[in-house]
């Protein structure tokens, strides 16, 4: 018996990722995407687009290519990474081009390149996918890589707020459980996990933005909330994301790197892991 794949929230609701305005269309073997940047997409305290949003757009382009290749099976993300040449722009339009690098019997890999309005490079990313292990999970209606978005911004609140992601304490961010956190395989959306990991890392680096973010998806988050804990030293961070509603199981391990700021000069390690391991009596 087939299980219907449904990535949307309840009737009358709009999925948070649709609010990002990322429109896609096919061009030969490539998949193109674009969206205008609005202030609500900025990293708090900066005028730069969130790197996690670029990760989400990379995941979208690569994921749609995977859907097109393995449909009616539902793809799940194995790895996702994004790397920027310089801090991302804070206005204008971002353009992305996705291409399949390898399509094997079990794993599909796609790459994505991002540019600005003038064609200048912003950064690049890659993602790998496999078919969901549950063979009953299939798309039961036609799928399309062409996704039009109504003109104008749909994001009316800061992205983390709209997604239900909050910084709980230094080094810790929580993605609240909601219908919108789940994807077509009925697991926590990989792009929203990227946002949660970014928030955990940036909570230890106020005013900074991420130069890179890499995520390895170890097992699906099935219940939520998702809790990310980060440790950062000299701008390099490692992050673990756990499913708090499923016995705190480790779902994702991630690494991050911030662009240098004028306040970063051999900063000591910070984060909940470091504090827990610090010997008593040391300052």
Predicted regions and their residues:
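Structured N-terminal alpha/beta-domain signature
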Residues: 167-168, 173-175, 189, 193, ...
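Short coil/loop residues immediately preceding or within conserved phosphate-binding loops
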Residues: 19, 79, 109, 212, ...
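Hot-dog-fold acyl-thioester-processing enzymes
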Residues: 11, 18-19, 32-64, 174-202, ...
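HotDog/MaoC-like acyl-thioester-processing domains
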Residues: 64, 88-152, 219-223, 232-283
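Preference for bulky hydrophobic residues occupying beta-strand positions
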Residues: 35, 80-82, 112, 127, ...
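Hydrophobic beta-strand-centered segment that forms part of the acyl-chain substrate-binding groove
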Residues: 62-95, 100, 195-233
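Non-catalytic linker/capping segments at the edges of enzyme domains
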Residues: 1-40, 127-179, 269-283
């Amino acid at each position: 018996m087939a299980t219907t794949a449904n990535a949307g929230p309840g009737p009358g609701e709009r999925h948070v990722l649709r609010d990002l305005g990322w429109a896609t269309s096919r061009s030969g073997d490539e998949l193109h995407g674009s969206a205008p940047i609005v202030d609500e997409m900025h990293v708090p305290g900066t005028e730069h687009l969130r790197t996690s949003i670029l990760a989400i757009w990379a995941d979208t382009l690569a994921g749609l290519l995977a859907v097109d290749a393995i449909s009616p099976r539902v793809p799940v993300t194995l790895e996702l990474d994004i790397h920027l040449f310089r801090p991302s722009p804070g206005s204008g339009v971002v353009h992305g081009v996705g291409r399949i690098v390898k399509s094997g019997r079990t794993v599909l890999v796609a790459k994505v390149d991002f540019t600005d309005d003038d064609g200048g490079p912003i950064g690049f990313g890659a993602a790998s996918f496999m078919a969901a292990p549950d063979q009953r999970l299939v798309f039961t209606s036609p799928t399309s890589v062409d996704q039009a978005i109504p003109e104008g911004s749909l994001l009316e609140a800061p992205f983390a707020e709209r997604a239900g992601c909050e910084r709980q304490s230094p080094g810790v961010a929580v993605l609240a459980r909601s219908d919108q956190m789940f994807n077509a395989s009925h697991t926590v959306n990989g792009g929203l996990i990227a946002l949660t990991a970014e928030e955990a890392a940036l909570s230890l680096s106020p005013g900074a933005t991420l130069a890179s973010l890499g995520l390895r998806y170890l097992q699906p988050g099935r219940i939520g909330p998702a809790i990310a804990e980060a440790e950062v030293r000299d701008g390099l961070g490692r992050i673990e994301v756990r499913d708090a509603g499923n016995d705190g199981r480790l779902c994702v391990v991630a690494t991050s790197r911030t662009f240098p700021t004028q306040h970063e000069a051999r900063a000591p390690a910070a984060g909940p892991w470091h504090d827990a391991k610090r010997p008593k009596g040391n300052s």
